[in-house]
Regions:
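Ferredoxin-type iron-sulfur electron-transfer modules and their immediate structural context
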Residues: 1-246
Length: 246
């Protein structure tokens, strides 16, 4: 296989042709934050939405059928010669390319994109001044339990990315969405209140397993809403392989 050479943050890197900027950076231990990327999955950007998804009996229709997935937008970088920032997870590295992963413009855009994710996800624990020594319960700042910690606290990808990118001061308080929590299915529970719309579960179901029991639509604000393609996992064709939660 042919190889190419590119420069990322002043470091010259040689990778196989077809490698993305994000993958190239990781071969050189250059960290580019991301939430929707997974090495075994195709990029979230341009992944097709479906006509409708279900949260149990509640049907959610696609408000933007002309659009496809956008990805999280956290992995944006600058490519010399391009006026627009590029998503590192979906942009192929090109021979001679010069990439910058950290500067004021990039950091501002990442914070902007993170804000749109944080605004629809419980995040009180990520902004709490006492989060490093928190015992999770009771809350010393009297934040209601449904607005704060989940079981992933301390081991959460969103928390790690937020710590690196920086949580915008303008992040509004999360308003509880009261999405349903499904506990009756075998092997795993589904709590849509914790979904950040990364669509990794959707892509794992479709591209790793070839099942397509899960899908996503775009709501009125263009945000991804994930759900099953029928009212139940069984009716959606789920095999309970757990690829979506692995």
């Amino acid at each position: 296989m042919d190889t190419i050479r590119l420069t990322i943050d002043g470091q010259q890197i040689e990778v196989p042709e077809g490698t993305t900027i994000l993958e190239a950076a990781r071969t050189a231990d250059i960290y580019i934050p991301s939430l929707c990327f997974h090495p075994d999955l195709p990029p979230a950007k341009d992944h097709p939405a479906v006509e409708a998804v279900f949260h149990g009996h509640h049907k959610i229709e696609n408000a933007h059928p002309e659009q496809s997935g956008k990805g999280c937008g956290i992995c944006v970088v600058e490519v010399a010669g391009n006026s627009e920032l590029a998503g590192a997870c979906a942009t192929a590295a090109v021979d001679g390319m010069v990439v910058t992963t950290q500067n004021e413009r990039i950091e501002a855009k990442r914070r902007e994109n993170l804000l749109s994710i944080m605004a629809r996800h419980r995040h009180a624990c990520l902004t709490c001044a006492q989060r490093d020594g928190c015992s999770l319960s009771p809350c010393s700042t009297d934040v209601p339990e449904n607005e704060r910690c989940c079981e992933q606290f301390g081991h959460c990808e969103l928390q790690q990315v937020a710590n690196f990118v920086g949580i915008p001061d303008t992040t509004p308080r999360w308003v509880p969405t009261d999405y349903p929590v499904f506990k009756d299915d075998p092997l795993f529970e589904r709590d849509y209140n914790l979904c950040i719309g990364c669509t990794r579960c959707v892509r794992a179901c479709r591209d790793l397993r070839g099942i397509e029991a899960l899908g996503f639509v775009l709501d009125e604000n263009g945000q991804a809403q994930v759900g099953t393609v029928a009212e139940t996992l069984d009716d959606s064709g789920c095999k309970f392989c757990t690829a979506c939660v692995a």
